[in-house]
């Protein structure tokens, strides 16, 4: 894919991340710790010139502005896409809720949940 992830729409960026995740899955297959997949995805995206921050700390506030605590998203890509990595047999509702919590806390609109642990990439 030759699209520019810096200036393109979010769908182009998501396509690049999914494509890169699939390449990693074909190479590594399942069975590794999540951190291995996180590092692999961050590394390959950076090689493509895409900005990636790992274990990005997200602050959670109460409605009055009081800091309640922190969450850590696996990957923040181009400052506009949160990517949560899993290495489980299959995704469950709690995984989706976790990503949605990260999106609310960060006020970022878009997220991807990628599972490398199943018989096929999810």
Model regions and ranges:
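Short, low-complexity, charge-dense intrinsically disordered segments
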Residues: 1-9
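Active-site metal-binding core of divalent-cation-utilizing nuclease and nuclease-like domains
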Residues: 30-80, 88-89, 119-122
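A short, surface-exposed helix-loop junction/capping segment
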Residues: 17-27
């Amino acid at each position: 894919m030759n699209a520019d992830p810096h200036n393109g729409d979010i769908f182009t960026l998501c396509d690049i991340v999914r494509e890169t995740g699939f390449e990693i899955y074909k190479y590594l297959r399942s069975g590794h710790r999540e951190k291995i997949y996180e590092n692999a995805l961050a590394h390959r995206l950076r090689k493509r010139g895409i900005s990636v921050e790992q274990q990005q700390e997200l602050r959670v506030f109460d409605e009055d502005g009081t800091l309640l605590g922190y969450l850590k998203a696996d990957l923040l890509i181009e400052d506009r896409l949160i990517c949560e990595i899993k290495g489980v047999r299959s995704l469950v509702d709690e995984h989706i809720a976790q990503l949605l919590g990260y999106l609310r806390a960060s006020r970022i609109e878009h997220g991807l949940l990628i599972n490398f642990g199943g018989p096929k990439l999810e």
